[in-house]
């Protein structure tokens, strides 16, 4: 029987949470067993799978390959990489090393690689559908106006929860799911089922991340027909679906040197106002489009053959 090993470099972050969901899906639908190694950059764990998927950043990938190279020899290995940092080692030959086939799940990253003379193929994330029945609530059935989800870096509010706090102060019913930087009404460490319930019961995903590559919470919100009010910068420029906010400026910020986009306050006010003035009929139509956007681009349920093709259908 085929076994997949997921090498991830997070602990309760987007990489290992996605791997966990994929592992459940693969077992239920393909009878494929999985091994998930979290924080793999900090430890050397025996790789049991004949097939390997690596979830990490372009920055950490060279370190991970160095550590696990011997264990990856002879295995079918695919790396699905992204990074919101400006310190990506774009020209590092390890990204072309045959030990593992490298893809990026970020069109923002792909564009920057191409600009600097390196071709990296793009493939969207394979996300098990958290709403497989496709049930969508209408505008009037949704309890919250806005939701923002994200665990932040320690040195600044990278996920932009402050903007969620602002709409709370303005009188809207909004909620944040956060970790280190939390403002106003918020929740922490939610199980998936509660998080998905929040998506289903919220009108708009407030996508105000200052630095981002494929944002799992935003994409999962689309599965529940929840469109976005989002900053049109970094990866959100490609995956945002709904009402865009203009950036005020783009810079580098944080101890890790993040690509940083600040929000234009006037554009933010206009976008929030447009969202809250939208009619029931127009919203419900947009909600259905958001759901289709997820189904057509990200749903693993609809892309099993494409997933298997990563390994030349040997899985």
Curated annotation (Swiss-Prot):
Gene3D superfamilies: Glycogen Phosphorylase B. GO terms for molecular function: glycosyltransferase activity. It comes from the Viruses. Its EC number is 2.4.-.-. InterPro entries: YkvP/CgeB_Glyco_trans-like. Keywords: Glycosyltransferase, Transferase. Belongs to the glycosyltransferase group 1 family. Glycosyltransferase 4 subfamily. This is Putative glycosyltransferase ORF315. The lineage of its organism: Viruses, Viruses incertae sedis, Ampullaviridae, Bottigliavirus, Bottigliavirus ABV.
């Amino acid at each position: 029987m085929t076994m997949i090993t997921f090498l991830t470099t997070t602990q309760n972050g987007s990489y290992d949470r996605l791997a966990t969901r994929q592992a459940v899906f693969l077992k239920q639908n393909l009878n494929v067993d999985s091994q998930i190694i979290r924080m793999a950059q900090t430890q050397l764990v025996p790789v049991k799978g004949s097939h390997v998927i690596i979830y990490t950043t372009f920055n950490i990938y060279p370190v991970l390959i160095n550590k696990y190279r011997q264990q990856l020899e002879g295995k079918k290995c695919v790396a699905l990489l992204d990074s919101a940092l400006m310190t990506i080692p774009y020209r590092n030959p390890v990204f072309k090393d045959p030990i593992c086939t490298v893809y990026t799940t970020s069109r923002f990253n792909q564009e920057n690689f191409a600009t600097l003379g390196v071709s990296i193929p793009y493939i969207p994330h394979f996300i098990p559908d958290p709403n497989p029945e496709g049930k969508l609530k209408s505008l009037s059935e949704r309890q919250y106006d806005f939701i923002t989800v994200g665990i932040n870096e320690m040195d600044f509010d990278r996920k932009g929860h402050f903007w969620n706090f602002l709409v709370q102060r303005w009188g809207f019913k909004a909620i944040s799911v956060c970790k280190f930087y939390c403002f106003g009404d918020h929740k922490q460490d939610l199980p998936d089922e509660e998080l998905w319930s929040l998506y289903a019961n919220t009108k708009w995903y407030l996508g105000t991340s200052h630095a981002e590559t494929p944002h799992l919470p935003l994409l999962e919100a689309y599965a529940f027909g929840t469109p976005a009010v989002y900053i049109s910068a970094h990866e959100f420029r490609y995956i945002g679906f709904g009402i865009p906010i203009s950036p005020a400026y783009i810079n580098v910020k944080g101890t890790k040197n993040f690509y940083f986009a600040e929000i234009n306050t006037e554009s933010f006010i206009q976008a929030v106002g447009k969202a809250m003035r939208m009619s029931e009929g127009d919203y419900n139509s947009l909600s259905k489009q958001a759901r289709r956007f997820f189904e057509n681009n990200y749903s693993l349920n609809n892309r099993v053959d494409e997933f298997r093709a990563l390994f030349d259908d040997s899985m």
